[in-house]
Design a protein with these regions (language model features):
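Small/aliphatic-rich secondary-structure junction motif
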Residues: 2-51
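A short acidic, glycine-rich active-site loop
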Residues: 54-66
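Absolute protein N-terminus
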Residues: 1-2, 141
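Class I S-adenosyl-L-methionine
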Residues: 22, 69-76
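Structural beta-alpha unit
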Residues: 73-107
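Gly/Ser-rich helix-loop-strand patches that form or flank binding pockets
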Residues: 97-141
Length: 141
């Protein structure tokens, strides 16, 4: 069974990539295993001095669920079973690490996300994942 990792952040381009990927699933003889991944940026500065770790973890979980919501809805609408995950860290590093952990066959990613670089043709996260990953990457525009 093929295993796909789709990093999503809740952006329009991320959700469009999920919608296009769903259309491609007809090409496969058997239903693949699909993992949605949302990566939250770690809290910076002195936040931990004022907010307890549990509250920070809850914040990351809440924001991660928001980032996954539309993609999960698209999968549900199409009747596709998927697993979803939320992690915290540097997005490109966490995407590649998680893809290796689950032994995925391909990373499917949109060209841009919610980051500062969203106006560029190819966002920095997608670009770095394509450069650094030893796992094949499918960029869906």
């Amino acid at each position: 069974m093929l295993k796909f990792l789709l990093p999503v952040d809740g952006s329009d381009t991320s959700n469009e990539a999920v919608a296009e990927f769903i259309k491609l699933l007809d090409w496969y003889k058997e239903e693949p295993e699909i993992h949605l991944l949302n990566v939250q940026f770690p809290q910076r500065g002195n936040v931990a001095l004022f907010i307890d770790k549990e509250s920070i973890n809850l914040y990351h979980q809440d924001e991660g669920m928001k980032g996954l919501q539309a993609a999960r809805g698209l999968m549900d609408q199409a009747g596709i079973v998927c697993q979803f995950h939320i992690t915290v860290g540097n997005p490109e590093e966490m995407i590649i690490r998680y893809a290796k952990e689950i032994n995925c066959d391909q990373i499917v990613i949109g060209p841009r996300g919610l980051g500062v670089m969203k106006g560029l043709l190819l966002g920095s996260v997608a670009s770095k994942v394509m450069q650094l990953s030893t796992i094949p990457v499918l960029l869906i525009k």
